[in-house]
Amino acid sequence: MEDFVRQCFNPMIVELAEKAMKEYGEDPKIETNKFAAICTHLEVCFMYSDFHFIDERGESIIVESGDPNALLKHRFEIIEGRDRIMAWTVVNSICNTTGVEKPKFLPDLYDYKENRFIEIGVTRREVHIYYLEKANKIKSEKTHIHIFSFTGEEMATKADYTLDEESRARIKTRLFTIRQEMASRSLWDSFVSPKEAKRQLKKNLRLQELCASLPTKVSHRTSPALKTLEPM
């Protein structure tokens, strides 16, 4: 699964997911299903925001090619993917500027057109079950919830889907592609089934313990290939 994640997702998304997991003391090499889930969620958040701007009249517009006009403002503020301190700083700044109620939990996005925070969900289960779980956790009518599934289903607060149909279709297509790619590598079943995922996690832990017991020769040189991946 780890190899699939690194091949399937943009390196920036992979790096953000790794940082997020390490912030909570989790290892992407062991909890590979969680690694894949975080990368998927991050990509959906970025796709949700892509190409959406607000013009000088306050209207929402889509700009898909070239540099957007200087007068245009990004419609969505992306909160997901930031470290917790920076994320809360952004949330507090938005609340102070707009007067919206501060959420109890970190949301994923802020919509400057509708003036509301958005919680994005990506589920391998039934969308309505995951939606209810999110709603029960957040317990706030002010935070908008939008759930996507790998089967093309979606559910949103008051059936308000925020984005146009084409933008949502792009997200659904990407999720379906991820599912197909996982299935072709025999990874989908363990990604969906908690029982199978637990078995895979134990296998990863055993492999790590085995590798740790082997004698190793440490090299302090950085390969040319790895140098290209180092942050600037």
Curated annotation (Swiss-Prot):
Site (Important for efficient shutoff activity and nuclear localization): 195, 198-199
Residues the record marks as site: Important for efficient shutoff activity: 202-203, 206
Enzyme Commission number: 3.1.-.-
Compartments, as annotated in UniProt: Host cytoplasm; Host nucleus
Active site annotation, chain numbering: 80, 108, 134
Top-level taxon of origin: Viruses
Keywords, in A-Z order: Decay of host mRNAs by virus, Eukaryotic host gene expression shutoff by virus, Host cytoplasm, Host gene expression shutoff by virus, Host mRNA suppression by virus, Host nucleus, Host-virus interaction, Hydrolase, Viral immunoevasion
Function statement: Plays a major role in the shutoff of the host protein expression by cleaving mRNAs probably via an endonuclease activity. This host shutoff allows the virus to escape from the host antiviral response. Hijacks host RNA splicing machinery to selectively target host RNAs containing introns for destruction. This may explain the preferential degradation of RNAs that have undergone co- or post-transcriptional processing.
Domain notes per entry: The probable endonuclease active site in the N-terminus and the basic amino acid cluster in the C-terminus are important for the shutoff activity. The C-terminus acts as a nuclear localization signal. The C-terminus is recruited to host protein complexes involved in nuclear Pol II RNA processing.
Similarity section: Belongs to the influenza viruses PA-X family.
Protein name: Protein PA-X
